[in-house]
Amino acid sequence: MGARRLGREIALQLLYSRDYTVGEASSLLEMVFDEAEPGTAAGRAFSDELVRGVLEHRETIDATITEKSKNWAISRMAKVDLNILRLAIYELLYRGDIPKNVTINEAIEVAKKFGTEDSPAFINGILDEVASTLPDKG
């Protein structure tokens, strides 16, 4: 598994944990990394950036999800799906170095691993809507 995929998976676990626990992001990050594979420094750095980025821009990210998820209230979305969307939308909006199709494909793969049977299609639909409004990355 690549460092970025691992980073995305760890970031998802951390954001999911934050939905159910009270604590600083850094202490939760340490807890998640204690259970991760050894030798994951690159994944850890990427995961840390993703989590901090999502937390910093959560209001904008959630507004984007609300706008693009027709007939779905954020409060009714599965927490795993919601956090996969938050991570991917952070990448789409704020990481100009990652191609849109890579971000979407990675989110779908993470959804296959952590979500329900319906998660990949749900996430793909919303991310396609978001990506269609963004300029192509150079």
Curated annotation (Swiss-Prot):
GO CC terms, sorted: cytosol
Protein's GO biological process: DNA-templated transcription termination; transcription antitermination
Gene Ontology MF, one: RNA binding
Keywords assigned: RNA-binding, Transcription, Transcription antitermination, Transcription regulation
InterPro entries: NusB-like_sf (IPR035926), NusB_fam (IPR011605), NusB_RsmB_TIM44 (IPR006027)
Coiled coil: none
Listed NCBIfam families: nusB (TIGR01951)
Function: Involved in transcription antitermination. Required for transcription of ribosomal RNA (rRNA) genes. Binds specifically to the boxA antiterminator sequence of the ribosomal RNA (rrn) operons.
Assigned protein family: Belongs to the NusB family.
Name of protein: Transcription antitermination protein NusB
